[in-house]
């Protein structure tokens, strides 16, 4: 039985990793071992970053809504509770966009929430 040397496969894998490491500084773009470590770390960080982006945007939307509701003398949590009681089903992204681009409409939403809280 012939010995399998895997030269073709390892060359293909090395080229793939070095292609992904293109633009890295120094040996990280030229040496397979360090390039592989850098690529693995970069791919892991990009995966984590995609998950964190969702959290970051939600936090941003909440901060914007909170700022807009406090201008109208209401806290964020009470506003969200009032909106829920009123049966208005708008997500936080849309609420933050309304707060920025159409303050009058947002003030009307705050008034609806206040009425529901007092009722």
UniProtKB/Swiss-Prot annotation:
It comes from the Bacteria. GO terms for molecular function: rRNA binding; structural constituent of ribosome. PROSITE patterns: RIBOSOMAL_L20 (PS00937). GO terms for cellular component: ribonucleoprotein complex; ribosome. Binds directly to 23S ribosomal RNA and is necessary for the in vitro assembly process of the 50S ribosomal subunit. It is not involved in the protein synthesizing functions of that subunit. It comes from Clostridium beijerinckii (strain ATCC 51743 / NCIMB 8052). The lineage of its organism: Bacteria, Bacillati, Bacillota, Clostridia, Eubacteriales. Coiled coil: none annotated. Belongs to the bacterial ribosomal protein bL20 family. Keywords: Ribonucleoprotein, Ribosomal protein, RNA-binding, rRNA-binding. Pfam families: Ribosomal_L20 (PF00453). GO terms for biological process: ribosomal large subunit assembly; translation. This is Large ribosomal subunit protein bL20. The gene is rplT.
């Amino acid at each position: 039985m012939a010995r399998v040397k895997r030269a073709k496969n390892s060359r293909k894998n090395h080229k793939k990793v070095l292609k992904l490491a293109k633009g890295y500084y120094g040996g990280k773009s030229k040496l397979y071992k360090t390039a592989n470590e850098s690529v693995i770390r970069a791919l892991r960080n990009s995966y984590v970053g995609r998950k964190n982006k969702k959290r970051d945007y939600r936090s941003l939307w909440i901060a914007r809504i909170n700022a807009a509701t406090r201008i109208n003398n209401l806290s964020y949590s009470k506003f969200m509770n009032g909106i829920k009681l009123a049966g208005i089903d708008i997500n936080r992204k849309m609420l933050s966009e309304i707060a920025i681009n159409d303050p009058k409409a947002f003030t009307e939403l705050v008034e609806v929430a206040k009425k529901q809280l007092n009722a």
